[in-house]
From Swiss-Prot:
It comes from Acinetobacter baumannii (strain ATCC 17978 / DSM 105126 / CIP 53.77 / LMG 1025 / NCDC KC755 / 5377). PANTHER family: TYPE III PANTOTHENATE KINASE (PTHR34265:SF1). Catalyzes the phosphorylation of pantothenate (Pan), the first step in CoA biosynthesis. Pathway: Cofactor biosynthesis; coenzyme A biosynthesis; CoA from (R)-pantothenate: step 1/5. The keyword Cytoplasm applies. Its cofactor is NH4(+); K(+). Substrate binds at Y95, G102, I103, D104, R105, T177. Pfam families: Pan_kinase. One of its GO terms (cellular component) is cytoplasm. ATP binds at D7, I8, G9, N10, T11, R12, L13, K14, T126. This is Type III pantothenate kinase. The keyword Signal does not apply. CDD domains: ASKHA_NBD_PanK-III. One of its GO terms (biological process) is coenzyme A biosynthetic process.
Amino acid sequence: MKSLWLDIGNTRLKYWITENQQIIEHAAELHLQSPADLLLGLIQHFKHQGLHRIGISSVLDTENNQRIQQILKWLEIPVVFAKVHAEYAGLQCGYEVPSQLGIDRWLQVLAVAEEKENYCIIGCGTALTIDLTKGKQHLGGYILPNLYLQRDALIQNTKGIKIPDSAFDNLNPGNNTVDAVHHGILLGLISTIESIMQQSPKKLLLTGGDAPLFAKFLQKYQPTVETDLLLKGLQQYIAHYPKD
């Protein structure tokens, strides 16, 4: 049985098609603030895939999600938008107001939380998100600007310093302004993660585009890099979704 999984973010639309739990197709595209139009261009392709259901993670507002829903009706198969709950599949949400937790973070936690394990789950995307779990209890977390947001903020507020797209490649003191900026930003984020990891024993799991970079500097914590963590969380969500 084939399923379609959509991850609709603020700037990108990602999709996976799976069959018998195996990914058979995956793509990610910028949607230029118009995800519904991008999806409209993909509908004919999806229509010929023999899909049986659709699971969606979307950070969009209600109006945009309704447009997405209308377009997907053309496929004439069940569509489920994942939502954050106070409790779901045994997982307790750590936010006072669960709906304020990003659906991407919730699904990442749902993908890995288990009774006798504690996790530090880090999403290395547009923001650096950190979520902590103790068994099946989500403890809340942290949100920080990522490497590039921090660098861009510094460029905007620093006169006379032109900073090219250099690699965030090590934590040594910089011997020039470019290296000092890049190494300093990376050191700040790595130090934050290390501080959290030192507070109590927990497994470290990294996901998102910069996950391999952060893993390189966090080897003493034996990090796991999970590329499709949100997909796994979305699959978990649908597996526990009430049947009609």
